[in-house]
C-alpha cells in the first residue's frame, strides 16, 4: 500500500509538473503568444471531447436496454477510448501554454503530456479496459469486428 501511494504521488507530480513550471514563472505576465492560442484551442477541444464522451457513455450505461453491451455509438463509433484522447489533448494543450516559459531544465515539463499518453495507452487505461472487454465480449463476433475496425485512440475520420 505504501508503494502504491508513493507511485500515485509520483504519477500526480509528473502529470502536473507542466502546470508547476508555468505557474512558477517570476516577473510580469508575458504577452499572449500563438502558443497560448494553440494551447487554449487544444485544451478546450480535449476538455469538450472528454466531457461529451463521458456523457455519452453514462447515458448509454443508464439505459437498461444496453445492459451488458459495449458502447459503439456517437464518439465511441470513431474511437474505442475517445475520453482518453480528450485527456491527452487537454494535457498537451496545457503544455503548449508553457512553450514561452520552457527554457533549460524547464523543458522537461514536456514529460507531462508524454507521460499521460504512455500511461493511458500502454500502462493503465487502454490495456486494462481492452483486456476486460476481451474477457467480457471476446467470443462475440460483432464486438471483435468493432474492435478490429475502430481505432483505440485516434479516430479514423474517413472510412
Task: Please provide the spans of the model-predicted regions.
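Short, small-residue-biased leader/transition segments that mark boundaries at the very start
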Residues: 2-3
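Hydrophobic transmembrane alpha-helices
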Residues: 12-56, 61, 65-159
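Extended, charge-rich helix/loop segments that form flexible
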Residues: 9
Amino acid at each position: 500500500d505504501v508503494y502504491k501511494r508513493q507511485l500515485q504521488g509520483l504519477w500526480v507530480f509528473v502529470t502536473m509538473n507542466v502546470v508547476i513550471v508555468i505557474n512558477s514563472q517570476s516577473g510580469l505576465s508575458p504577452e499572449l503568444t500563438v502558443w497560448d492560442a494553440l494551447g487554449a484551442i487544444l485544451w478546450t477541444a480535449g476538455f469538450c471531447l472528454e466531457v461529451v464522451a463521458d456523457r455519452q457513455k453514462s447515458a448509454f450505461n443508464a439505459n437498461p436496454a444496453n445492459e451488458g453491451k459495449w458502447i459503439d455509438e456517437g464518439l465511441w463509433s470513431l474511437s474505442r477510448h475517445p475520453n482518453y484522447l480528450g485527456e491527452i489533448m487537454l494535457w498537451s494543450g496545457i503544455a503548449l501554454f508553457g512553450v514561452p516559459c520552457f527554457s533549460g531544465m524547464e523543458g522537461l515539463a514536456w514529460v507531462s503530456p508524454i507521460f499521460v499518453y504512455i500511461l493511458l495507452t500502454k500502462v493503465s487505461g487502454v490495456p486494462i479496459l481492452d483486456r476486460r472487454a476481451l474477457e467480457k465480449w471476446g467470443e462475440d463476433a460483432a464486438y471483435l469486428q468493432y474492435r478490429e475496425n475502430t481505432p483505440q485512440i485516434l479516430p479514423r475520420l474517413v472510412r
